[in-house]
Amino acid sequence: MEFTASPKPQLSSRANAFSIAALMSSGGSKEKEATENTIKPLEQFVEKSSCAQPLGELTSLDAHGEFGGGSGSSPSSSSLCTEPLIPTTPIIPSEEMAKIACSLETKELWDKFHELGTEMIITKSGRRMFPTIRVSFSGVDPEAKYIVLMDIVPVDNKRYRYAYHRSSWLVAGKADPPLPARLYVHPDSPFTGEQLLKQMVSFEKVKLTNNELDQHGHIILNSMHKYQPRVHIIKKKDHTASLLNLKSEEFRTFIFPETVFTAVTAYQNQLITKLKIDSNPFAKGFRDSSRLTDIERESVESLIQKHSYARSPIRTYGGEEDVLGDESQTTPNRGSAFTTSDNLSLSSWVSSSSSFPGFQHPQSLTALGTSTASIATPIPHPIQGSLPPYSRLGMPLTPSAIASSMQGSGPTFPSFHMPRYHHYFQQGPYAAIQGLRHSSAVMTPFV
């Protein structure tokens, strides 16, 4: 008995559009189209940066897209290495571009990091690189103009993790989907050849980020992936209007293997952290004061003494207050944070320039601002010096007592320990100021 297959039910055009077969085929075509438009060129670029030759033998990439090693041999062509990031041109680079050489500055510092395994922090807002890529060029035409730019390419298609028990990086799996590749054009471009011969080019403003939606021009990287910075130099022609079309331009690419780094969100190797703190001049906040040398410590102390913000103007000096006398004239003046270049203490300036209503400075006290050579003893506390003079017992001095004291070794100031703040300041800033401004306000001794 023969069985005949029943004919497939015919679906309408509207129903056929929502069938499983139609949805799968349309989804596959869209995914394929998106892959061809976005991922494919970048995948070729990733493979281009890690194929054929080891990084140790790579020195430069000419305009034909071929690597030039130290021995002068070029790698064999590979199906994986078909197109670099910068469009290649079939024209062989001119002799002028072939003569250009590029050297890495601070190579010794890069070597130290490379031995430990360089790590670079990436953040959402962007983080600058340290060490910084600094290069110098030779063999350029002094009369020509050049554009210098930099990009950072993945070393391989692997993701890494740090093994703390082994203090080394291990392969953790396949790399994450590649992020949009960006070229960083040096902000001072175009350079003249004469400028490139006289100065080095620093990419200190380059920032690394892991924000895929970054709109600030930072270089986007994946964490726990290894990257290789590359420096490009392009000869600018008269018709070069922008850097968007590089197909007709002559360029050279230089690679320095010691600049390979791993992008991280937090340092993994403690030795890298220590080396960055010790080498980075902007990381002094992380250093312990015990690491300072004697010369550095003396310079810091002298800097503190020269600036008035090092000590509050209403803070009393430690220990007993010095009084003006015969012994103080032979003793050098105690160092003060208020001492200026002309040895005029800030307290004397306050006492001579600011007065309160109802009080008139003695004539000899106002002369402190003009004659300081005869005074070799420290000036009392700023606020204390601004008050009417009192005897050692805390009683106000009469004008005759003041005049007699001026004829001797100078005015007599209280030697007992004074409270830190006057009761005017305990009222709050606004109330204290209003009290001082009142016409009938009279300053009273510290209580």
Swiss-Prot record:
Residues 109-288 bind DNA. Coiled coil: none annotated. Residues 327-340 have a biased composition (Polar residues). InterPro entries: p53-like_TF_DNA-bd_sf, T-box_DNA-bd, T-box_sf, TF_T-box, TF_T-box_CS. Changing residue 121 to M: In ASD4; significant gain of function in sequence-specific DNA binding transcription factor activity; gain of function in sequence-specific DNA binding transcription factor activity in the presence of cotranscription factors NKX2-5 and GATA4 or GATA5. Residues 62-81, 316-340 are annotated as: Disordered. Keywords: Atrial septal defect, Cardiomyopathy, Developmental protein, Disease variant, DNA-binding, Nucleus, Transcription, Transcription regulation. It is found in: Nucleus. PROSITE patterns: TBOX_1, TBOX_2, TBOX_3. GO terms for biological process: aortic valve morphogenesis; atrial septum morphogenesis; atrioventricular canal development; atrioventricular valve development; blood circulation; branching involved in blood vessel morphogenesis; cardiac chamber formation; cardiac muscle tissue morphogenesis. It comes from the Eukaryota. Acts as a transcriptional activator and repressor required for cardiac development and may have key roles in the maintenance of functional and structural phenotypes in adult heart. It is linked to Atrial septal defect 4: A congenital heart malformation characterized by incomplete closure of the wall between the atria resulting in blood flow from the left to the right atria. Patients show other heart abnormalities including defects in septation, chamber growth and valvulogenesis. The disease is not associated with defects in the cardiac conduction system or with non-cardiac abnormalities. This is T-box transcription factor TBX20. It comes from Homo sapiens (Human). The gene is TBX20.
